[in-house]
Amino acid sequence: MSYDVLTINPGSTSTKLAVYHGDKVLFEETVRHTMQEFADFNNVQEQFDFRWQVLRRVIDAFGYDVNKLDAVVGRGGLLRPVAGGTYMVTEKMLADLKNNKYGEHASNLGAMLAKKLADKLGIPSFIVDPVVVDEMQPVARFSGNELIARKSIFHALNHKAAGRKIAKELGSEYEKMNFVIAHLGGGISVAAHRQGKAVDVNNALDGDGPFSPERSGSLPMNDFLEACFSGKWTKRELHELIVGRGGMISYLGTNSMLDVENKVQAGDEDAIKAFDAMAYQVSKEIGACSVVLHGKIDAIILTGGLARSELFTSKIIEQTNWIARVIIEPGEDELEALNSGVQRVLAGIEKEKVY
């Protein structure tokens, strides 16, 4: 049996919506937002009414009868660490999101918007595989100092969607296979997936792992400490050096990998060096994750927007295909992944979890 599900993905510069009947898209829309539209809002929570109006306007424009919906699902925001899966939106979850208890991000609005519409219709609301999915094995949490534990913050939704898709194509199930999955986008996360759980992964948000188009990844600690106490930067500015103005932006002044690739093909030496270094660091992280899985790997999967770049992926393949076959699953369809998680629950294939 197929179900009608509305999916909601609020991002920092867009609101993405779609209605599915089973795995068929009935309609899909991406509404882009300008900085001017958000100028009067002091924080993400103040955007709620604005995003609600966007949601209603899009649904009305397509003429869809919301009374046909069986469930609503929103992008999972910054919550306490949880295992992967599909979660019912609860008052406890909403309280943590509204108070930004674990951080502020546009995705925090996903569950809130889903809950409001679902309650009006008397149907369930969910989130699926939020970025705080934490399935790390205990040994992976050691950082090297007891004051700091390693955290699992990564592109869990796309990782697990890609893992499920490739496992099915290989005639098996995600929960029965071992993968190293690399999400390549504005942030880069590489995880060791052992039989359905991401047992080790770099923290793609807070300065860990490979550098990306706009994030620094891991930095030499003492040199960064010197920068912290030099008096040249505020805490906010230093944070931007890690997330927002790190990586390719710091080296080449742009986070557009299309621009970087054009420079590489034009023979720009600085671009070539930085491009090769990013591919090198991703490859090295993949190698590290292969050790986590004791070399027993069914496939290495490259996904995310950057996986569309043949030049970039070819460099990773060249350095890692001796470990295992490399499969490219380009892009990220978060709306489809959200829908799939809810369809599995509604069909009784999986059981929903409670936050």
Swiss-Prot record:
One of its GO terms (biological process) is acetate metabolic process. It is found in: Cytoplasm. It comes from the Bacteria. It is an enzyme of class 2 (transferase). GO terms for molecular function: acetate kinase activity; ATP binding; butyrate kinase activity. Keywords: ATP-binding, Cytoplasm, Kinase, Nucleotide-binding, Transferase. Its EC number is 2.7.2.7. The keyword Nucleotide-binding applies. HAMAP family: Butyrate_kinase (MF_00542). Belongs to the acetokinase family. This is Probable butyrate kinase.
